[in-house]
From Swiss-Prot:
Coiled coil: none annotated. InterPro entries: PtdIns-P2-Ptase. Its main location: membrane. Signal peptide: none annotated. This is Type 1 phosphatidylinositol 4,5-bisphosphate 4-phosphatase. The modification Phosphoserine is found at S162. One of its GO terms (molecular function) is phosphatidylinositol-4,5-bisphosphate 4-phosphatase activity. Ubiquitous. Residues 17-38 have a biased composition (Gly residues). The chain crosses the membrane at residues 212-232, 242-262. A motif (CX5R motif) lies at residues 133-139. Keywords: Cell membrane, Cytoplasmic vesicle, Endosome, Hydrolase, Lipid metabolism, Lysosome, Membrane, Phosphoprotein, Transmembrane, Transmembrane helix.
């Protein structure tokens, strides 16, 4: 009895002869071992696996499945693809053809798929940021906080001259703050207000000297007139009080003219530097 138990197989024999049971043995239902007993053996190839449907290639048991790819098969030809201008990856533009640019899913940078709008152009910053600006722009700044690079686009192709005339004038040095500014009013009244200190000065000495002499002579004449009027009407002033008012009026005019002459004499003078055209 013990010998029969030792010779019994480790796996029970299949009920149906070998294809569908849990215990599988070699062909013919048994395999002869070295000691005359039965030993388990591998099933025939394909006996334990259901057949694949027709039209699909079989995958071997030890073979890995093909890698997953989100891209559409080239055989379908339904999804339009473009190449990223930064990392050269493929970008699916299906449903995005109405846009001017698309974003790459690998490098997160924009790539144009259409021409820029009329009057605009695309510029790629060295940090790979895609910018859009006017065709006539010569300098643009990158908006990214960590870049802020100023990009010089260079001169644009020649076109018609600008209808706005170039500023014509003289560069002068302010007599107050010594800063340089442009003076464009070519008139006899050579007064100019400095845009830096907002103070008025004269361009050259000719105009304030002329005004100073005129005001001084007029004030001197009024002073002489007031003196003569006072001596000539001294006796009548005691009788007519209005004569005192005439004296005061003439004296006031003389003082104003002499004060104006002093103002022109003390005015700061701004000196021209060079012509500007």
């Amino acid at each position: 009895m013990a010998a029969d138990g030792e010779r019994s197989p480790l796996l029970s024999e299949p009920i149906d002869g070998g294809a569908g049971g849990n215990g599988l043995v070699g062909p013919g239902g048994s395999g002869a071992g070295p000691g005359g007993g039965l030993t388990p053996s591998a099933p025939p190839y394909g006996a334990a696996f259901p057949p694949f449907p027709e039209g699909h290639p079989a995958v071997l048991p030890g073979e890995d499945p093909p890698p997953y790819s989100p891209l559409t098969s080239p055989d379908s030809g339904s999804a339009p693809m473009i190449t990223c201008r930064v990392c050269q990856s493929l970008i699916n533009v299906e449903g995005k053809m109405h846009q001017h640019v698309v974003k790459c899913g690998v490098c997160n940078e924009a790539t144009p798929i259409k021409n820029a709008p009329p009057g605009k152009k695309y510029v790629r910053c060295p940090c790979n940021c895609l910018l859009i600006c006017k065709v006539t722009s010569q300098r643009i700044a990158c908006p990214r906080p960590y870049c802020k690079r100023i990009i010089n686009l260079g001169p644009v192709h020649p076109g018609p001259l600008s209808p706005e005339p170039q500023p014509m004038g003289v560069r002068v040095i302010c007599g107050h703050c010594k800063n340089t500014f442009l003076w464009t009013e070519f008139t006899d009244r050579t007064l100019a207000r400095c845009p830096h200190c907002r103070k008025v000065s004269s361009i050259g000495r000719r105009y304030p000297r002329k005004r100073c002499i005129c005001c001084f002579l007029l004030g001197l004449l009024l002073a002489v007139t007031a003196t003569g009027l006072a001596f000539g009407t001294w006796k009548h002033a005691r009788r007519y009080g209005g004569i005192y008012a005439a004296w005061a009026f003439v004296i006031l005019l003389a003082v104003l003219c002499l004060g104006r002459a002093l103002y022109w004499a003390c005015m700061k003078v701004s000196h021209p530097v060079q012509n500007f055209s």
